[in-house]
Amino acid sequence: MVPLVRGAGGSHQWLAAVLLGLCCLLPAGRLAAPGGDFPGAAADSLVVRKGDTAVLRCYLEDGASKGAWLNRSSIIFAGSDKWSVDPRVSIATANRREYSLQIQDVDVTDDGPYTCSVQTQHTPRTMQVHLTVQVSPKIFRISSDIVVNEGSNVTLVCLATGKPEPSISWRHISPSAKPFESGQYLDIYGITRDQAGEYECSAENDVSVPDVKKVKVTVNFAPTIQELKSSGVMLGGNGLIRCEGAGVPAPVFEWYRGERKLISGQQGITIKNYSTRSLLTVTNVTEEHFGNYTCVAANKLGMTNASLPLNPPSTAQYGITGDAEVLFSCWYLVLTLSSLTSIFYLKNIILH
């Protein structure tokens, strides 16, 4: 509403006539019907965006001496006398007949009915303009980032203002970008780890671009080991076992050979832990390093493990490794040559 104050100039008789005429035309405080009752009225309603300039058109008839603008029952202008203290309002006069009201930087408080009254030779004639101020959507409240355990029920809230009232929609920002039904509240029942991530709330009313805000949902779950794999090992060489895991919070990894916990930096063992994997390296492999290795992953929600044997090379299945294999080959060659010599010797005896 435009703030008002009584002007210092103008004819009191003219103002009295205007108010009296309005009282007669608007019994019991009711407003005149939209559309006015004199020619030259451009429109009976005006829609503008908040912050824009509104021009409420009104024109004087031939023979009309004065005009007045009122906001509900309060006078804004009487003729050229300004009764409002609001610096945003003025009279727009593109020609001698125009008597339009201009409001700069309109706000929602300016919303409502305005009446233009024109003094003719006989009686005041009026026209009403209803000003509607549209407001861009604005999200004023959204759920904070949350951390929940897998299987919990989650409710996200997004509240927005605007005129017209904005519609609210949600979507999960993921490779599938799954949309949800519109509404201020988004309910997720029995949330899973795949439903973790950012959720986007969008408020839209076609006045301007949608207002968008995001909330992050973190889903805790117990660790899982997805892969346990080793590289080939040889005596005197290096061996590597890789343990791939997942969990939120990130799991803590430990290693065991048999029942014994392994410590990085001891007995040629090096362990490097990352958020989703652990690497165990064995330097200068000896027979003592062979055995069953277990990777353990744990966080506050649980623990899991997986085991893998670290065995000698495939030749070890015959009990032959390293220098022994060379000796065995030499011995086998000697036996073979000896057998051939014996055969030739027997053949000569028979022939002779």
UniProtKB/Swiss-Prot annotation:
Record bears the keyword Cell membrane: yes
Principal place of residence: membrane
One cellular component term from this protein's GO annotations in UniProt: plasma membrane
Subcellular location: Cell membrane
Cysteine disulfide links: C58-C116, C158-C201, C243-C295
Residues modified by glycosylation: N71, N153, N273, N284, N292, N305
UniProt cross-references to InterPro entries, sorted A to Z: Ig-like_dom (IPR007110), Ig-like_dom_sf (IPR036179), Ig-like_fold (IPR013783), Ig_I-set (IPR013098), Ig_sub (IPR003599), Ig_sub2 (IPR003598), IgLON_domain (IPR050876)
Function: May be involved in cell-adhesion. May participate in the regulation of neurite outgrowth in the developing brain.
Protein name listed in UniProt: Neuronal growth regulator 1
Record organism: Gallus gallus
